[in-house]
Structures are given as C-alpha cells and as structure tokens.
C-alpha cells in the first residue's frame, strides 16, 4: 500500500470539483482565459502528456512519491515494522501570489477533509511547506507541500 500513497492524494484532489475547475483555467499570452478539457493535475499516478512536458500552462498541481522509510529494529527481525513513513510532495504552481495562496489552501483543505472522512491506509501525517519560489521563465509562483505519512504496510493476516 505504501507505494500507492500518492494515488490516495490524487484521488483526494480529484474529489474537489472547484479545485479541478480552477486547474482547467489558464490565461494565454494575449490575456484571454482558456479552459482546457482536463484539469492540470499530474504526478506519478497521472503522467504528464508528452506534448506538455516543456510548457505546462499555469496553474497546475503535481503529486510526487518522494520515497519511504521503515523503522525495522534490527536485521534479525523476522518482519519489518507494520508502518512505513511515506513522503509525498504536492507542488502547486500559479500565475500570481494570490492565486497560489488560494490554490494552496484549497489543496490543503481538500487533502485534510479527504483523509478525515475516507478510510485509507494513512494512519497519521505531518505537514510542511517549502518557501514560495518564483519562476521568471514561466512566469509563475510555486510552492511544494510535503506530507510525511504513517502508512500501514501489512495485511491483517501477514504477521502472526
């Protein structure tokens, strides 16, 4: 289950229709609002289309699986501990700081609500946010939210 934790986050974000709509809107170079067919929500669970790889329209969200650890006590333990600590990154990118703040709050609220109301393997998590960055080439603002999740990695009958 630990290796699919990013899919839980993608599913959570897909459950918010308002967020998905905001991820379909963009403004082209002449200031015209453009509505795409699909939201720009990407990650290891939803690949980035090849044609967009170099120039993804803003705004977008990318969910990444950033590795895991397991607190196995010693090499002589018969089993690993029943929980993995899984790191998930959620990159939020927007055209303006106001848009970034709004999208970031929507992402945080959506994930929190989903994890509180949906039975998943995620038992608990810690949250951190990196500083806001500016990309002058795009131009856009972005921020990475990091979730460190305790994920149950065992089946009920696995350890006797």
Regions found by a protein language model. Give the residues of each.
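Small/polar-rich, solvent-exposed N-terminal microdomains that initiate assembly or binding
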Residues: 1-74
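Hydrophobic beta-strand residues in large extracellular and virion-surface proteins
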Residues: 9, 13, 41, 61-63, ...
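Residue-level signal for secondary-structure boundary sites
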Residues: 70-71, 98-100, 153-157
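"Short basic amphipathic alpha-helical interaction patches in structured regions
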Residues: 77-81, 103-108
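Oligomerization/assembly interface segments of phage tail-like spikes and tubes
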Residues: 80-98, 140-153
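Acidic-leaning, charged glycine-interspersed low-complexity segments
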Residues: 105-160
């Amino acid at each position: 289950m630990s290796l699919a934790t990013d899919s839980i986050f993608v599913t959570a974000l897909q459950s918010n229709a308002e967020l998905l709509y905001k991820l379909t809107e963009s403004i082209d170079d002449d200031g015209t609002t453009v509505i795409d067919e699909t939201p720009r929500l990407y990650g290891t669970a939803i690949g980035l289309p090849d044609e967009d790889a170099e120039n993804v329209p803003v705004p977008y969200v990318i969910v990444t699986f950033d590795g895991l650890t397991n607190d196995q006590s010693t090499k002589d333990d018969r089993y690993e501990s029943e929980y993995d600590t899984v790191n998930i990154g959620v990159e939020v990118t927007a055209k303006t700081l106001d848009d970034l703040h709004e999208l970031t709050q929507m992402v945080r609220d959506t994930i929190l609500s989903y994890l509180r109301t949906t039975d998943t393997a995620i038992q608990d998590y810690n949250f951190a946010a990196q500083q806001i960055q500016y990309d002058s080439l795009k131009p856009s603002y972005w921020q990475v939210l990091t979730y460190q999740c305790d994920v149950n990695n065992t089946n009920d009958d696995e350890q006797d």
